[in-house]
Amino acid sequence: MKLLSRLLGRRRPNAGGQAAAMRPYFYLGEEIALTRLKCGHFIYVDPLEESVCSHLIAHGEWEASTRRVVLGLVNAGDHVLEVGGHVGYYTLGLAQKVGSKGSVTTFEANPRLAALSRRSIRMNGYNDRVEIRQQAVTDVAGDIRFSVSRQFAGGGHLYVWDGALGADTEVIEVEGIRIDDLDLPDVKLIRIDAEGSEPLILRGAEKMLQRHDIILCIEWDLVQMSSRVQMDTFISWLADRDFLFWKITGSSELAPLTVADLATLPPCDLVVARKQPVLGLGQTR
């Protein structure tokens, strides 16, 4: 435990000859390591995972502009639903932002990632407000096949074909659930990063989406989503529910989009709501 009780304080010269602080990183074995995020949270990571964990280890952050918007969408006491929590990077920030009177319910189908996330939540003292559920969210309840990879764990998804994530792809069976079948408090924000399953997840949340003030933050990837649904039908489905759309920019701003824009939009993160959200960016870190 002595290793975990201190941070690395040594400095080394970088390529330009200037001193650069070493990233705090604690290797705990082949399966697990611990690092500290720029925001101050400690987070458990898989040292062999390259899609997200490598960035957290090297830089202490990931998708900084999107994270800033996500945290800016919630306030103390809010309730958040997260689908695709990975190792808990967004989860930790959301837990801090909603405070002890709020809650975060996070779904992560990959058992390895869910276990790491639970450890991080416990270490940072958020067990009172966060629940990590190792289940897949979709539009039909029941056991489903789910593709996982240790090297590229950020790409885990509802099964499409064998080997989709490379040589170490493994297909596991997990419990699938619908959001509308859950007994949850009044959710303000749904954050979804599900590698193309976003349309299925939202169709299983139709009752929750009837809340006038609901806000969605979703990954938008036409290629991935079109493997699940007809995109013109899905876009019309969203528009028919009076949703408006904004793209999250690299400077953490919300750029308005038309419904027509969605059909040709390159991969990005969207905020979806029925009125322009107010971002509390000054309160995030």
How would you name each of these model-derived features?
Residues 45-52, 153-162:
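Short, basic/glycine-rich phosphate-binding loops at helix/coil junctions
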Residues 152-156, 278-281:
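Short, charged/polar, Gly/Pro-enriched secondary-structure boundary elements
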Residues 32, 178-285:
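Conserved acidic-Pro-Pro-aromatic motif
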Residues 49, 85-87, 111, 137-139, ...:
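Short, glycine/acidic-enriched loop or turn micro-motifs at the edges of active sites
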